[in-house]
Amino acid sequence: MNVGSNEEAETLRHLFGVRWPLVVRYVEWLSTAGLERGLIGPAEVDRLWERHIANCAALAPLIPVDQRVIDVGSGAGLPGIVLALARPDLEVLLIEAMSRRTAFLREVVADLGLRDVTVENSRAENVACTAPVVTARAVAPLPRLVKNVAHLLEPGGVLLALKGARVWQEVHAAEHLLAKLGYQPGVEVLTVRAVAGQLTVQRDADASNDRRWATVVRVIKQ
């Protein structure tokens, strides 16, 4: 398991700053207890940094300062714990429906000393609180996701969903649902890349995977 290319390592170290040792410890959690408890597949252990940590860290520059964030379907803490490590100014609520995953999250949060991170064992549909930012990764296709989290977003709040190769198919399938669910019209597709040790964000960028860390869908609540 390695951090990836020199540029990826430089960018990650810059992003996490003094919390870098905590990120390393979190990766150790994922590759040991996370693997043993079935939260991380065996094939993922050697690519945790580039496929998971870097991918989740790409959300960090998209969130304004001092925000409350609800991370739905947190699983092993991706992206919620990564965000909390990269952005200590954020207050993060991790929502996870499976008890064994919730137990793992609570152990990790306690071990890393993340005081502004709370874990709730619940389905997103049953959560009553709201936040200006909701994040999601590998939770559901976009049409179902925008429906399940609409009640969690404050007016003007933003849903940030990490997506893969089928992003445009999901966007087209979800667009007709936005108005009836209380979202603003239109979906933004953002590409986050590492350039010269910094993360850059482009809107509707080309499909090239060169230096791409993540593809993020951004939807805004009315």
UniProtKB/Swiss-Prot annotation:
Species of the source: Acidothermus cellulolyticus (strain ATCC 43068 / DSM 8971 / 11B)
Name the record gives this protein: Ribosomal RNA small subunit methyltransferase G
InterPro entries: rRNA_ssu_MeTfrase_G, SAM-dependent_MTases_sf
Pfam families, alphabetized: GidB
NCBIfam families per UniProt: rsmG_gidB (TIGR00138)
EC number: 2.1.1.-
Record key words, sorted: Cytoplasm, Methyltransferase, rRNA processing, S-adenosyl-L-methionine, Transferase
Gene: rsmG
Similarity comment: Belongs to the methyltransferase superfamily. RNA methyltransferase RsmG family.
Keyword Methyltransferase: yes
One MF annotation (Gene Ontology) recorded for this entry: rRNA (guanine-N7-)-methyltransferase activity
Reported function: Specifically methylates the N7 position of guanine in position 518 of 16S rRNA.
Alphabetized SUPFAM superfamilies for the sequence: S-adenosyl-L-methionine-dependent methyltransferases (SSF53335)
Predominant location: cytoplasm
Compartments in which it is found: Cytoplasm
GO cellular component: cytosol
Domain of life, source organism: Bacteria
Enzyme's top EC category: transferase
Coiled coil segments of this chain: none
Residues noted as binding S-adenosyl-L-methionine in the record, renumbered to the chain: G73, L78, A124, E125, R137
